[in-house]
Regions:
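Intrinsically disordered, low-complexity regions enriched in Pro/Ser/Thr/Gly and acidic residues
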Residues: 69-150
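N-terminal start-of-chain detector that recognizes signal peptides
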Residues: 39-40, 63, 116-119
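General "foldedness" signal
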Residues: 36, 55, 59, 80-82
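Hydrophobic alpha-helical segments
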Residues: 1-51
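Short, glycine/small-hydrophobic-rich surface segments
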Residues: 49-74
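Residue-level signal for the start and early helices of compact helical domains
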Residues: 13-16, 25, 57-61, 137
Length: 150
């Protein structure tokens, strides 16, 4: 009986010591994944504006489709509160973790087209979200439009 009690006590102590390290690893993995995906969106906007010709609407201009993957909370990933995309950049918030903004680095104007009356696209559900970036020439200004595909 004493051996069983000691074994259980030792197991609980080891688990209690390991939980903060596991949570830290979850947050770091999620942060790395989000930063990579958001930098891909930024790179697509930059490349689109730098390497393609803008045309006048209503003709469709050059476009790119980029995927942002919000991980679901599990043993290897922390939960994502939100990813917000506006004209300034892309901001993520991790539940009980950090938040950060990846700014756009393009000479073109960036316009976000959300589905509702908001000024930003907000992603909250875990899973893959597809964004369409298109380049148009509006009022003598090269403009990158960003909208959700799904």
């Amino acid at each position: 009986v004493i051996r069983t009690v000691l074994t259980v006590t030792l197991a609980v102590a080891i688990l209690a010591a390991a939980v903060p390290a596991i949570e830290n690893a979850q947050i770091q993995r999620t942060e790395t994944t989000l930063t990579s995906d958001l930098q891909s969106v930024r790179a697509a906007a930059t490349a689109l504006a730098a390497s393609e010709d803008a045309i006048e609407p209503p003709a469709p201009g050059a476009r790119r489709v980029v995927t942002v993957d919000l991980p679901e909370r599990d043993l290897s990933a922390a939960a994502v509160e939100s990813v917000r995309i506006d004209a300034e950049g892309l901001t993520y918030r991790i539940v009980e973790g950090p938040s950060d903004t990846v700014p756009f680095e393009t000479d073109a104007r960036v316009v976000v087209r959300p589905r509702n009356d908001h000024e930003a696209i907000t992603l909250t559900a875990a899973g893959r979200h597809h964004l369409v970036l298109s380049l148009q020439y509006v009022n003598a200004t090269r403009t990158v439009y960003i909208e959700r595909l799904d």
